């Protein structure tokens, strides 16, 4: 393996790990216990890292005049594969799906609680306020239900 490809592989691995750990669903989780590692999260990390690989080649070309066609092509192909994996949810099992849905519901709780506490629109519109409170309650209930299903 040549130096440039080894370097790109290290960059890709770092970007993949950052993509998984700093995924918005994880950052916005209401509780740390609502964060699970799932295939969908891995697919998202692959999507982020592969897009960074090919877009890095474009930036590198614009700023320095160098372009590696092979790395660009591999990045594009990995992006296409990751889109396919995300859209089809290939290999995602019942438990994998539940793990991702818990994070999704937890994000809804975080954003709803924040908007309810800081936003006059929610408190001045009784319909919207009721909807938000119901959503908060239902998401909590569904998270408990899904966590029980995982056990």
Regions found by a protein language model. Give the residues of each.
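His/Met- and acidic-residue-enriched segments that coordinate or traffic transition-metal cofactors
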Residues: 1-151
